[in-house]
Amino acid sequence: MAVFEMQNARKAFGALEVLKGVSLKVEKGEVVSIIGPSGGGKSTMLRCATLLETMDSGTLAYGENVAAREENGKSVYAGKAALAQVRRQFGLVFQQFDLFPHYTVLKNVCDAPISVQKRDRAEVEAEAIALLDKLGLQGKENAYPYQLSGGQQQRVAIARALAMKPEILFFDEPTSALDPLLTGEVLRVIRSLADEHMTMVIVTHEMPFARAVSDRVVFLDGGVIVEQGSPEQVFENPQQERTREFLKSYRETSSAQA
């Protein structure tokens, strides 16, 4: 059974239809990168997947837990208790870190497992320190977010998401708010998670990274999945003209900035 499955998701903001029947299925241990132009629907799809937005129509499930079914052409969401269970199955790392500024690094990582999952504090703190060490943040447990670089803050955000022991981890442009010099350290962390077969969906504009780390690449544009396949197929032999145009534009922009 798939860890995550969205079928025929539609979402409009007023008269603007942002998602036009998007379907995505992610298997355990799979790394899926979502690429595409700004305004193409990537972040909206991620927000619908993680219950930050509701779909107008379509279905959403995490394993056996159904978050939304479809009735009479509309999405009908599960009750509060069922959705709380669904939320325990995924983690989300935003582009803007969203750390609590008045909490130490350790408390940022430990807060949700203790307060939401009601886990033992000593056990959670020991796991959190091990996570921080693994992510290259040794000795930062008592620091506050303002004392960290952007790359360090994003790694704390990743540790916070992992501390909840999710079955799947979503990333929304995890490096877009970082100085280019700090981007590499965050990408290395995500790559290490991929090497450990963490199930992940990554919305990214980092094409070389998407190519290197992904099992599957999905090109989303105009609210629809235009093309998907292996990194080799999508980047080296795209089948759709829109995909070819997007990659050509990306390469031209990258060359101009080099």
Predicted regions and their residues:
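Short coil-to-helix segment of the ABC ATPase nucleotide-binding domain corresponding to the Q-loop/switch region
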Residues: 103-111
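A short, proline-enriched helix->beta-strand linker immediately N-terminal to the Walker B motif
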Residues: 163-167
